[in-house]
Amino acid sequence: MRRVLALVGAALVLAGCSRGVPVPPPEPAPEGVAAYACAQMKGLLPALVLGHPTTATTPTSTNTQAWGDPAIVLRCGVGVPAALTPTSQLITVNGIDWLPEQLERGYLFTTVGRTPVVEVSVPDAYTPESDALVDLSRAVSTLPVATPSPSPSSS
């Protein structure tokens, strides 16, 4: 019995120490319609991405969500990336245009032609990284199309 209590106590201590994945919320935070759209989309996000369950984020934010370890991270309400130019090569996943940017250890995908803007960082542990976008597309597709849209698939 003492061993069971010790294990339960250790589990509670460990649970109390785990604060979640550090994910900085978008700055400035979305307001008004954008904040509402992010909150609505977050409520539609899947429980699993690439078969990995949601993971707590810190600080807690209605504009962030994470899955797995290493974490696949979504942030809603970010700014338009500086890397987006009229000649940027985009990928389209389930009708949503994304700007892919290779990182040191994975990819950052940012929506193009949706408002508010969403970014998803996918570590290279999940190759091909763009597969995560398939799982997220249903929720992201609920975000309004930007007008005018800079995205090639909206014309």
Annotate each predicted stretch with a short phrase.
Residues 4, 25, 54, 63, ...:
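Short, well-ordered helical secondary-structure segments
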Residues 13-16:
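C-terminal motif of bacterial Sec signal peptides marking the signal peptidase cleavage site
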Residues 81, 85-155:
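Extracytosolic low-complexity repeat regions of secreted or lipid-anchored proteins
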Residues 18-73, 78-80, 155:
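Extracytoplasmic low-complexity, Pro/Thr/Ser/Ala/Gly-rich segments
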Residues 1-9:
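N-terminal export and membrane-targeting signals
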